[in-house]
Design a protein with these regions (language model features):
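Short, low-complexity, polar/charged sequence segments that are solvent-exposed and flexible
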Residues: 24, 53-57, 79-81, 112, ...
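Conserved C-terminal guanine-recognition region of P-loop GTPase G domains, centered on the G4
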Residues: 83, 98-184
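Short, surface-exposed, polar/charged, turn-prone segments marking secondary-structure boundaries
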Residues: 33-34, 62-66, 88-89, 119-122, ...
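Nucleotide-state-sensitive switch-loop elements of NTP-binding domains
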Residues: 2-8, 13, 17-135
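C-terminal accessory "lid"/substrate-recognition subdomains
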Residues: 151, 159-273
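Extreme N-terminus of proteins, especially the signal/transit-peptide cleavage junction
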Residues: 1-2, 222
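Flexible, charged surface loops at secondary-structure boundaries
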Residues: 27-28, 85-86, 146-147, 255-256, ...
Length: 273
């Protein structure tokens, strides 16, 4: 059976950065992996950030966003069925930062998916300097994503003080209490600078598994509490952007019958760096 891992992380926690490192370890081991970007947004920015992982041992897939929850679940199920035929050793699922984790477990229990996949690990990434003043809805999302995790990985721990890390863990446990979950985190917390991770650290994460846990559900309507905003190439001035655009339009290769074939090349050439 194909191992399947769920990597959750509250908004801005750094889970995409973690997945790049986690996936690279698997690739270096020789595993054949698939990464499924499972996002509600109409634009999947995280998939663009993972593009450099693509190769013989790693393929990226995504679920088209911009649909309701039921449609999203059907697309998730369909994509897993297709990926189950690709011969992967492991599939890594990266959901949005406001994901209902029950979707993952419910779909994995469906036939024929339950005969093809075995749940490996649920890992939750939490910012070591977690904002203390979160709304009830944000605390719920934080707790619901962490409740079933085999391991909580703190991001940016090298930038946090011991007091900030202590406060983050306390906040996480308070969020668990708010959703009437009996679980409290201590030994499951992984605190280490990601740049210093060794093979043994990744192997520990690969063996963390997951924890079946119950908590009180909160119904949150789509768009009720969070909206997606995209800020890209903010280091460019208006004049620099205009100059780059003019160069693209002046490029003769971008016109004519060969336009379709050269479009990708021209986009690379005019990329704002």
């Amino acid at each position: 059976m194909v191992k399947i891992d769920l990597i959750t992380g509250f908004l801005g926690s750094g889970k995409t950065t973690f997945i790049k490192k986690y996936a690279k370890h698997l690739i270096d081991k020789g595993d054949n992996i698939g990464i499924l970007e499972n996002d509600y947004g109409a634009v999947n920015v995280d998939m663009m950030l993972l593009k450099d992982l693509e190769g013989e041992k790693c393929e990226l897939e995504m679920i088209a966003g911009g649909c309701d929850a039921d449609c999203h679940r059907r697309r998730f199920r369909t994509k897993l069925i297709a990926m189950g035929m690709c011969g992967y050793d492991r599939v890594i699922v990266e959901p949005s930062g406001i994901y209902d984790v029950d979707e993952f477990f419910d779909v994995l229990r469906d036939d024929p998916i339950d005969r093809w996949y075995e749940i490996g690990n649920v890992i939750t990434v939490v910012d070591a300097k977690l904002e203390s003043d979160l709304s009830d809805e944000a605390d719920y999302l934080l707790a619901s994503e962490a409740a079933n995790a085999g391991c909580i990985v703190l991001s940016r721990s090298q930038e946090a003080t011991a007091e900030e890390i202590k406060n983050t863990i306390e906040h996480l446990n308070q969020a668990m209490e708010k959703v009437q979950c009996n679980r409290r985190f201590r030994d499951e917390i992984f605190v280490k600078d990601w740049e210093t991770f060794e093979s043994a650290d990744y192997e520990k994460l690969l063996a963390c598994g997951y924890v079946p846990e119950n908590y009180r559900k909160m119904h949150i309507e789509e768009g009720e509490t969070f909206k997606s905003l995209y800020f890209m190439n903010l280091d460019k001035t208006k004049n620099e952007i205009i100059e780059t655009a003019e160069k693209i339009f002046a490029d003769k290769d971008a016109a004519g019958a060969d336009h379709g074939r050269t479009e990708s090349r021209n986009c690379d050439r005019g990329k704002l760096k």
